[in-house]
Amino acid sequence: MAAAAPKRRMGLEKIGLYDVGRAIGKGNFATVRIARHRIAKTKVAVKSIDVSKLDKENLIKLEREVKIVTMIDHPHIVKCYEIMRVDNMLYIVSEYCSTGELYATLMGKGRVTEDIARKWFTETAAAVSYLHNKGIVHRDLKTENILLGKDSKIKLIDFGFSNFQTPDQLLNTWCGSPPYAAPELLLGNSYDGMKADIWSMGVLLYILVTGGFPFGSESVNDLKRSVLSGVVKIPYWVSVECADFIRKMLVLNPTKRMTIQNVLAHRWMHIRNDVKKQVQNLESSIRPTPSKLNPTIMMFMQQHGKWTEEQIIDAVLGRNFESPIFATYELLADKVKIGSLEGTGEEYPRRGSRGSILSGRANVDEQPLTPTISAHQLAQLNLSSPDCDSDDSSNSDLCDESPLSSLEPNHKQFTLPRGLDLMGNRFENRRHTLCASEQLLSPNLMGQFPPPNLLLNNFTMSPLGFPPMPEGQAAEFPFPSLHPALGAFPTTDLSKMLPVPKSERRASAGETLLPTNFDLQQHLANLSANPVSFPTVEEEGRSYLAKYGGKRNTVHCLGNQIGGGVQNPIPRYQRTPYAKAPPAERRSSWASPSLSQQQQSHLEKIFKDALQTNNDISRLHKEFKNLSHGCAQSQITNEGSSLACPQISITDEYNRQHNIAPSASSFDPVSIFQKNAQEVVFGQRPATAIGFSSTSFSGMSTPEQTTRSMDDRVRSIVCTLPFAEVVEELKSSLNILKIPFAETQEMVYEPQVTEMRRLSLPSGVEIGVAVLPPEHKSHVEFAIINNDSPTSEILCDQLICRLRMIDPNWSSE
């Protein structure tokens, strides 16, 4: 193994003060590799980009990413340490998280509980709130861009698509991942980046609590149709508060979508913690630019980095990310922050006593001219941990190209390095407790130990530590100190030692509770040689009936013919006393399967007596006959077709699957273009266990009955273009949007015979185009059948805008 270490070290690429190893991620233009700082002995992630392969637009995005990562500092955002430019390569050195992506954790463990989801989502929301307050939008929030750091803390990464945005500004660049993209991005419209981040956060929370995506699809077109439908199906195990939270973030209309302040104030976020206080604590924990540097770190850097004090102060206070001095100081400061060493505020510790209060004299010892680093402080800076290694074993981790090292980074701290013996390396798991390599005992104490006896090297020792004796002669050394070979070694009198404890131990020693080998043999010897006999199924049944047969709800007796045995085994589902009873024998609580003739005649007599008397029962009987006769006659219309009965649905999912509205039987879309109806009243949607969701046909997003005027649901426009041209333009626009429709041709007879063309959309929009005979114009009406479909309103606005663009002489009705 000693010869293998230099070989591995030769495979490390040296970039600046870093030993760069294996790749842990790849993108379109960049590669991320794990590296190790040679002075701080800390693992970092190095993102390398070949600038020569980028065009002008991507170069602008890269410089914008560098500007953003160097101006943010948050506990739940991966920290940037250094920016290096070497020839045509740009290197971004950032914090390394060994646990891996949140996506890999969810793929391995599935959905998490709402408590864990609340913790992770709160930390993500705190990071997004920090970015939005600085005028930065991420635009690529997803599980792949969220890492888990120490103690499962969220770390947000990848600011390649980030941008600056003011409150009154809209963005136009399409970016991000389609499953997390907001509907305004899928439509290609200008969008608010902060509202797009809120939509991605809603998808993220849905994935955490359900383990799947809210909009399932096999292609981008299917995804677009699923998102624009506005239907979000939430499983039953999600709480009402969480379901309401998800629906308010996944609102199609961005103006009605939540802001980051609304997200932090939602009641689901405050179930088990105070989110506002937690966010304030996170913001207060952000380390500002120090006005005075830590003298211990500065001394350590001067000894190992050969930098002067002025160079260190200028680079750190100026936050020069392109200087290795700033990165070294930040890495060492993070290590000191983890430990107990913090800046004391004084350049050197005060020495001496405070003196006498009466005399007013203070006895202060003279301070040394040259400050020194104590062993404890040096141990803090040389601290070893899974992310901060100080030995050569970390090089094997940097060079290991095995798939396990890249796919399962969280298993490294539980396994031993390759090629090391288990017993010889048993204490390596506690390397973080080792301090600096200095002499732990003073020379005075070392001088008190006797020098080693050189004569021991000339003796052939036995396994027990004593020289072999001649055959037939026993060793007669009553005390170990009388042994001739143990001259100057200190010995211990075994008679003064504590007695060996018995096998009685504390309850925490679990192995003592188990029986010994002798106890097991004695127990097996006492067992009988005869096998244990168990009762058969028939014997169990008879015993059960003998004990509980007198009860009211049990079988009275067993039949004479009982199957079973070896030849005819009883099926598993029939091994119960109730299955053994013959059909004639029943429970006492069961009703009779048939009526006797005497019982039948008695019931008929009671029925006739009740109808002969003029009482309430007879009147109800007559009214029931009349109602049933009337319903039977009116059930068939003149055309011979039966009317469809209104179906009652109890869940939103049933309504969406079968396209059933609360008033589907009484609502006629054709009447919109033939009658001047003023109001349409939709019923109250039922409350479900999933929460008060907004569906395609339910009235509002809350269980309240609402009334909307027809003017809000029907929009009309008069075009001067010919009738056929308007119809073709509408059909062409729908085909471009990839929205299916059904076309029908009808005739309107009031006030005069005119032709009308109808386009029916599955989303609940009816488009009617009719001819106005006197002016030879086209009358277009858009009717929204759904009561709360923002998608339908947006679609109607787009089609009306299209008609206005091609017809400058349009007019409203």
Curated annotation (Swiss-Prot):
Q: Which domain of life is it from?
A: Eukaryota
Which coenzyme or cofactor does it need? Mg(2+)
The record's annotation in Gene3D superfamilies points to: Transferase(Phosphotransferase) domain 1
Which molecular function term from Gene Ontology is one that the record holds? ATP binding
Give the similarity note.
Belongs to the protein kinase superfamily. CAMK Ser/Thr protein kinase family. SNF1 subfamily.
Q: Does the keyword Nucleus apply?
A: yes
- Where in the sequence does UniProt note compositional bias of the Acidic residues kind? 388-400
- Please explain the role this protein plays, according to its UniProt record: Regulates chemoreceptor expression by phosphorylating the hda-4 class II histone deacetylase (HDAC) and inhibiting the gene repression functions of hda-4 and the mef-2 transcription factor, enabling the correct sensing and transduction of food signals. Role in determining body size, the dauer decision and serotonin-mediated egg laying. May modulate the Sma/Mab pathway and regulates development in the later larval stages.
* A GO BP entry: positive regulation of multicellular organism growth
Its source organism is Caenorhabditis briggsae
In Swiss-Prot or TrEMBL terms, this protein is called Serine/threonine-protein kinase kin-29
Residues annotated as catalytic:
140 (proton acceptor)
Q: Which SUPFAM superfamilies match?
A: Protein kinase-like (PK-like)
Q: Name one Pfam family in it.
A: Pkinase
- Entries under InterPro entries matching the protein: Kinase-like_dom_sf, Prot_kinase_dom, Protein_kinase_ATP_BS, Ser/Thr_kinase_AS
The record's catalysed reaction(s) read:
L-seryl-[protein] + ATP = O-phospho-L-seryl-[protein] + ADP + H(+); L-threonyl-[protein] + ATP = O-phospho-L-threonyl-[protein] + ADP + H(+)
Keywords, comma-separated and alphabetical = ATP-binding, Cytoplasm, Developmental protein, Kinase, Magnesium, Metal-binding, Nucleotide-binding, Nucleus, Serine/threonine-protein kinase, Transferase
